[in-house]
């Protein structure tokens, strides 16, 4: 894949999360014929290999060519997984439209030649080449020579073009062309037929290997265990297929309503028509009525306004107001023109329009942006259908270990062939014995053993109200070493209590008006702002909306109504929202206030603005938002000089502070024509709204538990920086002895380059710091003692963006100690999580779903505290809306990881014990009988495999993690040491039994009554007690090796069953302990009981009691040595840490490398300094390593 023909290679979705490499290939008839012949002569093995390795299928059938000539494309993901897939290039024929619309090859099919659709149509035959990848269509752009996504309006369109080109709808001809090329507007998730699920599961390499093993066992008349494996496989496959089928049905029900909605579509010539939503295409003009409607596509609002419930996307059921896209004479793309807040104009698929307000034309109109799987809901569904692979390192290690076992089996096969060929055995017997070695050395149950711990952990989590849609991520939970938390609704309570209002005038701030006293708020602009500056709606007689807005409005004791119901005021449009004072409100000179227009709140802008009309009075604009943002839009002389210190008083106590401002407008301006920039300027500052947002009771103890376990905790919030710092201190995320350093970065302005400054936050000394974005207390100096303490960096989303753009080399150094990230937008939250992952942290993200969906999806482990549909994108959802689920999840993850490794070690040892025993017996051209194999495989190993994993998670989080890799020194040493120990014991038993005075190769007798008499034990081969069926297996070597191997399997299970510090002690697993006791008792009973019939069944020989005691002694010594080695060496963390230090081993994790390289620089952090992006030294700074997390990554 290193050399490509010209035009053969390209990138699909370049720069996006689902970026892929695409390679062009052309099918060759001769290659196809050869592969068909190979499939026949290999009895279907070749197609199976091609199924497992898609790239091999393409390389075998096709030759490389340019993408333009390709009929097959090979796709490879650009992430670390490098997953291959292939797709056939298909043709879409538009020739059918010739007769319907009279199209000619030269006829422009679209009104603009720049549209992708025009460039994708091959003329004169009117055909389109396309591929379908993960439910998305990509068409070949002949002009640019690349595959491009179709099903969306082009991003380059400006707002003026959207209004002009699509404001009147599409012609019928354009609709039909787009329908053919873009496909139907459906999110089809078919309920996968059971037979398909069954075939897919059966073709798993694990089950193919089992099929091979079963066939071999049937040929050897080893029917009992073959049937047992078949039954277990059927149960396993049935459960898996059932789970997959249930998930498929649930997902189908989740999206099926989307495909059967009737909508009103306006055509350019056809007028308004009622159509099925499945026929919608990008560019269609939707007409929204006042009725509730579920959006079947993504659409941009161009006229009127809507109130939308976006709970499915955000996890939050607070209605959101959408405003029309302004028509501006500019060629700038509409998303760029709207900046980060373009979503305020977009109605997303799957959201519910609960209220549509018409504009002057009397209609609410929206242009379809995206259809089908290109929509927001389609993207969410695709993330479920095609999840990002997890725990790849563990899977890769498992494959490597299996390959080692295969290598061992190969050596055993060569040994077997040599022994049996030299012995003159028949060829078919030699082959059968050689193949037996594979099923012994590579046990069919090995892959399943790795998942059993996960299954039990999932059940325990379910009992705690934690639900999981991606069970494989439970193991990843055991590796978490950094957890990010949203603040509002996650660390703090959902509800906000209005504590008071601080108004201001020319003399500065007035006394706090407390609502606890029950006194009504005096009339004035501040009262009017509280009554009208919100996004509340009246739905079925109930006021609904953001809790903050609701608390603020309720404090005024005003009422809400529609203008069309009780009021008929000139200049107020029909059905405008009107607020009016009630009887209990203070004396008000106006009859009411009509809300004419809203500029909705967004987390990116951190403010909202409304235009209102006092009935019989002035037209006003009110703004509400983050204090620092609102103050920046006000006339400087109206902002009190004590603004910073006043704000500090409340934010340092953890209050949430909102600022209010207003201005008068001219009555002759139409409210909807005014731009946001015009309205939001030269405002008059009104005061501060103080709301209380208390910590949840569970927050502090949970964070203390995580920190004591050396798991980093990070806060990512959209709230004020000072409030975030206060919450971090109150919650224990930042202790009293630790310092907080503010990092502030500013964009390039004029001639000055981007800058970054570092300041120590001081809680005791109050000094004014007048920057608009951050109002916190600082101090100028840091004592030497302070420098030696722990530091936590705090910064805003704006600073994070500037650092990412202009100081990227400093970003990893800042993240080493970055703890508080405030004013973060949803996109910045996702980016921050990704940056932590680049430093090799295992990142967890816990949020309530509101604005956290991207970060929840990006993290290794996303934990949603919301039960909305958005939680579908998160692997874990907690029914209990607090962060107590986080330590529970980590504990269960650690337990599941340790359990998986324990089972892996046990299954590997069990196979090696049996492997060693069989190869020793092969030396004597002997083996174990079917019943002997059955007893070991079914009665011992299967029962242990089922019960060994029942240990629960240890209730305490320890300050280190379990090993995250199968190929780790302690685990490898444990496996190799125990294999060698068992090998030594088996060889010793094998040799010693042959040197006993009573030993004879001619003994084939069952037990005698007086077996102490050697003479009675030594019988002739022709003795009547001899049984023909036993002549192949019965020998003293067989008896000795079988007892040693069988009981060794039991003792190894006890040695490998781990308890503290990650799992409950073994003695608490009562079922497992009982199984071991019964198994050991049965084995000892068989060993010492003289029951001829039992011995005949198991093909065993009686031996003197002294030899039986010798077997027990050998097993006891083996158990004691193994247990001591496991506890004193393998599980001795202190010893391994000392060995690491002696050999100078250092972690290769990126963040550990940063810590080692930058830990001892006395100049870090550069306090009271400002660096600029054009200064060379700013990119070569050094970082401070936080001693709190110094040994966070140490693991065995």
From Swiss-Prot:
Inducers of expression: Decreased by half in the SLI patient lymphoblasts.
Membrane topology (Lumenal): 219-223, 422-436, 922-932, 994-1035, 1092-1109
Subcellular location: Early endosome membrane; Late endosome membrane; Recycling endosome membrane
Pfam families per the UniProt record, alphabetical: Cation_ATPase, Cation_ATPase_N, E1-E2_ATPase, P5-ATPase
Binding site for Mg(2+): 848, 852
GO CC terms of this entry: early endosome membrane; endoplasmic reticulum membrane; late endosome membrane; plasma membrane; recycling endosome membrane
Stretches in topological domain Cytoplasmic: 1-31, 53-197, 245-400, 458-900, 954-972, 1057-1070, 1131-1196
PROSITE patterns cross-referenced by the UniProt entry: ATPASE_E1_E2 (PS00154)
The keyword Nucleotide-binding appears for this protein: yes
Bilayer disposition of the protein: Multi-pass membrane protein
SMART domains: Cation_ATPase_N (SM00831)
Keyword terms: ATP-binding, Chromosomal rearrangement, Endosome, Magnesium, Membrane, Metal-binding, Nucleotide-binding, Translocase, Transmembrane, Transmembrane helix
One Gene Ontology term of the molecular function aspect: ATP binding
Intramembrane extents: 32-52
Principal subcellular localization: membrane
Catalysis: reaction(s): ATP + H2O = ADP + phosphate + H(+)
Catalytic activity, EC: 7.2.2.-
Active-site residues (renumbered): 486
Coiled coil ranges: none
Tissues in which the UniProt entry reports expression: Expressed in heart, placenta, liver, skeletal muscles, and pancreas. Lower levels of expression are also detected in brain, lung and kidney. Weakly expressed in the adult brain. Expression in fetal brain is higher than in adult brain, with levels similar to several other fetal tissues including spleen and skeletal muscle. In adult brain expressed at low levels in all tissues examined, including the temporal lobe and putamen. Highly expressed in the respiratory and integumentary systems.
Disease: A chromosomal aberration involving ATP13A4 is found in 2 patients with specific language impairment (SLI) disorders. Paracentric inversion inv(3)(q25;q29). The inversion produces a disruption of the protein.
Similarity field: Belongs to the cation transport ATPase (P-type) (TC 3.A.3) family. Type V subfamily.
Name of protein: Probable cation-transporting ATPase 13A4
Organism taxonomic ancestry: Eukaryota, Metazoa, Chordata, Craniata, Vertebrata
């Amino acid at each position: 894949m290193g050399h490509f023909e010209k035009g053969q290679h390209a990138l699909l979705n370049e720069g996006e999360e689902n970026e892929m490499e695409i390679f062009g290939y052309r099918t060759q008839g001769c290659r196809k014929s050869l592969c068909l012949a190979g499939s026949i002569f290999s009895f279907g093995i070749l197609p199976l290999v091609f199924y497992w390795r898609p790239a091999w299928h393409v390389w075998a059938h096709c030759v490389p060519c340019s993408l333009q000539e390709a009929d097959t494309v090979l796709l490879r993901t650009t992430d670390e997984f490098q997953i291959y897939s292939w797709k056939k290039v298909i043709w879409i024929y538009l020739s059918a439209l010739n007769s319907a619309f009279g199209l000619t090859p030269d006829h422009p099919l679209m009104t603009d030649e720049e549209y992708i659709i025009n460039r994708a149509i091959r003329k004169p035959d009117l055909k389109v080449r396309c591929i379908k990848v993960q439910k998305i269509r990509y068409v070949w752009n002949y002009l640019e020579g690349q595959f491009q996504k179709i099903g969306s309006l082009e991003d380059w369109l400006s707002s003026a073009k959207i209004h002009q080109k699509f404001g009147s709808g599409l012609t019928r001809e354009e609709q039909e062309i787009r329908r053919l090329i873009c496909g139907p507007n459906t999110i089809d998730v078919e309920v996968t037929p059971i037979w398909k699920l069954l075939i897919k599961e059966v073709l798993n390499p694990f089950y193919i290997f089992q099929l091979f093993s079963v066939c071999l066992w049937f040929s050897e008349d080893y029917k009992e265990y073959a049937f047992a494996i078949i039954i277990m496989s059927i149960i396993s496959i049935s459960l898996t297929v059932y789970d997959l089928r249930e998930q498929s049905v649930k997902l189908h029900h989740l999206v099926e309503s989307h495909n059967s909605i009737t909508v009103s579509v306006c055509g350019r010539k056809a007028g308004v028509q009622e159509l099925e939503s499945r026929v919608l295409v990008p560019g269609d003009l939707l007409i929204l009525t006042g009725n509730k409607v579920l959006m079947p596509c993504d659409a941009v609002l161009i006229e009127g306004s809507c109130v939308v419930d976006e709970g499915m996307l955000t996890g939050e059921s607070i209605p959101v107001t959408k405003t029309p896209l302004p028509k501006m004479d500019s060629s700038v793309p509409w998303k760029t023109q709207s900046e980060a807040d373009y979503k305020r104009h977009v109605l997303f698929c799957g959201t519910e329009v609960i209220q549509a307000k018409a504009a002057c034309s009397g209609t609410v109109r929206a242009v379809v942006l995206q259809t089908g799987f290109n929509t927001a809901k389609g993207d969410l569904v695709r993330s479920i259908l095609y999840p990002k692979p997890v725990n790849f390192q563990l899977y890769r290690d498992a494959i490597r270990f299996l390959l080692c076992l295969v290598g061992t089996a190969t050596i055993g096969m060569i040994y077997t062939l040599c022994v049996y060929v030299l012995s003159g055995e028949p060829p078919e017997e030699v082959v059968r014995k050689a193949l037996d070695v594979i099923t012994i050395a590579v046990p069919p149950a090995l892959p399943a053993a790795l998942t059993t711990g996960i299954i039990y952990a999932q059940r325990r989590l379910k009992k705690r109200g934690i639900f999981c849609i991606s069970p494989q991520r439970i193991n990843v939970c055991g590796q978490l070493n950094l957890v990010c938390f949203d603040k509002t609704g996650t660390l703090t309570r959902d509800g906000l209590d209005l504590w008071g209002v601080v108004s201001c005038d020319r003399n500065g701030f007035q006394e706090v008006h407390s609502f606890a006293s029950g006194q009504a708020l005096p009339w004035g602009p501040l009262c009017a702002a509280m009554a009208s500056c919100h996004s509340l709606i009246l739905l079925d007689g109930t006021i609904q909306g953001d809790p903050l807005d609701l608390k603020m409005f309720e404090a005024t004791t005003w009422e809400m109504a529609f203008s069309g119901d009780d009021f008929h005021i000139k200049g107020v449009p029909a059905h405008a929202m009107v607020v009016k004072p009630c009887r209990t409100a203070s004396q008000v000179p106006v009859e009411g206030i009509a809300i004419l227009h809203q500029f909705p709140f967004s987390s990116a802008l951190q403010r909202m603005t409304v235009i209102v009309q006092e009935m019989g009075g002035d037209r006003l604009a009110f703004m509400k938002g983050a204090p620092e943002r609102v103050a920046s839009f006000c006339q400087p002389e109206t902002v009190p000089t004590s603004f910073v210190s006043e704000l500090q008083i409340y934010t340092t106590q953890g209050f949430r502070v909102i600022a209010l401002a207003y201005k008068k407008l001219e009555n002759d301006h139409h409210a909807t024509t005014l731009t946001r920039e015009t309205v939001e300027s030269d405002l008059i500052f009104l005061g501060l709204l103080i709301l209380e947002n208390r910590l949840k009771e569970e927050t502090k103890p949970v964070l203390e538990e995580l920190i004591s376990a050396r798991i980093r905790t990070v806060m990512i919030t959209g709230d004020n920086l000072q409030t975030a710092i206060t919450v971090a201190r109150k919650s224990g995320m930042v202790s009293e002895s630790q310092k907080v350093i503010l990092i502030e970065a500013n964009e390039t302005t004029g001639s000055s380059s981007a800058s970054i400054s570092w300041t120590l936050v001081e809680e005791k000394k109050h000094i004014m710091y007048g920057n608009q974005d951050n109002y916190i207390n600082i101090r100028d100096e840091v004592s030497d003692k302070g420098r030696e303490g722990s530091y936590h960096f705090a910064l805003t989303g704006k600073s994070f963006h500037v650092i990412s753009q202009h100081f990227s080399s400093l970003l990893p150094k800042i993240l080493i100690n970055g703890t508080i990230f405030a004013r973060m937008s949803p996109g910045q939250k996702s980016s921050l999580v990704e940056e932590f992952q680049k430093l090799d942290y295992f990142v967890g993200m816990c949020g309530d779903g509101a604005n956290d969906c991207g970060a929840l999806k990006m993290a290794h482990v996303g934990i949603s505290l919301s039960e909305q549909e958005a939680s579908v994108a998160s692997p874990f959802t907690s029914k209990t809306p607090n962060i107590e689920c986080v330590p529970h999840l980590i504990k269960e993850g650690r337990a599941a990881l340790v359990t998986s490794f324990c089972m892996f070690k046990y299954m590997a040892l069990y196979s090696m014990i049996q492997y060693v025993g069989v190869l020793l017996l092969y030396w004597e051209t002997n083996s174990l009988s079917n019943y002997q194999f059955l007893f070991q495989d079914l009665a011992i190993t299967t029962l242990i495999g089922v019960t060994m994993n029942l240990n629960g998670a240890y209730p305490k989080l320890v300050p280190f993690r379990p090993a995250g890799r199968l190929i780790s020194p302690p685990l490898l040493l444990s496996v190799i040491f125990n294999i060698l120990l068992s090998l030594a014991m088996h060889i010793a038993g094998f040799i010693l039994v042959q040197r006993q005075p009573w030993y004879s190769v001619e003994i084939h007798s069952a037990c005698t009554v007086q077996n102490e008499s050697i003479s009675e034990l030594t019988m002739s081969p022709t003795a009547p007690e001899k049984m023909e069926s036993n002549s192949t297996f019965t020998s003293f070597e067989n008896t000795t090796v079988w007892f040693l191997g069988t009981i060794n399997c039991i003792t190894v299970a006890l040695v490998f069953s781990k308890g503290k510090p990650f799992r409950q002690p073994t003695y608490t697993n009562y079922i497992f302990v009982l199984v071991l006791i019964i198994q050991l008792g049965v084995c000892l009973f068989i060993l010492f009981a003289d029951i001829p019939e039992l011995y005949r069944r198991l093909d065993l020989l009686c031996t003197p009691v002294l030899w039986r005691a010798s077997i027990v002694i050998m097993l006891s010594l083996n158990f004691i040595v193994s247990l001591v080695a496991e506890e004193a060496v393998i599980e001795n963390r202190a010893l391994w840490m000392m060995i690491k230090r002696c050999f100078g081993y250092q972690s290769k994790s990126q963040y550990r490398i940063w810590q080692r390289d930058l830990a001892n620089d006395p100049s870090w952090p550069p306090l009271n300094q400002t660096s600029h992006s054009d200064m060379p030294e700013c990119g070569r700074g050094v970082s401070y390593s936080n001693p709190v997390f110094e040994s966070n990554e140490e693991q065995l």
